[in-house]
Amino acid sequence: MNKILLSTATAFILSLTACSSHAPEKRVHRILTDRIQTLAVAESCTGGTIAARFTALPGASAYFKCGVVAYSLDTKQEILQISCDTIARYGAVSEQVVRQMAEGVRRASNSHYAVATTGIAGPTGGTPEYPVGSVWIAVSTPLRTTTRLIRAGGSRNAVIRKAGTAAIELLEEEL
């Protein structure tokens, strides 16, 4: 009997920790909704994954202003106003570019917060400095912009998923 209870209790606890209600986007959703604050995203290597995770939640229109998938250099320059000099000097996958992406989309959308990603999802395109799975993420707030480099392993889809989660978790930290 005790083994059955323990097994049932363990299964229940595991189901709670795996439950999608614990996803970071749901926690951010609640915080932004409660504070009546807004969010915008600018994504390169994550290709709209972050925007999709937020807009999949009922009530996202209360805080989600826009998502820009800036995959090409032209889009980064024309829509997000990333400096040509910054891209030429540091490259598209850099702390400087992701910072400008987050600040640019926050400014353009007049949002309280913004998240941005740029990186190499793979399976090709890596360099010695930035191997496949290297992703710069940034969160821009009214007070500061925070950046972080992650190294996500696995397949292209795994890199995209991990980078999206890391970006949302960084946003949650900054809230």
Describe the predicted segments one by one.
Residues T8-A23:
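Bacterial Sec-dependent signal peptides at the C-terminal "C-region" and cleavage site
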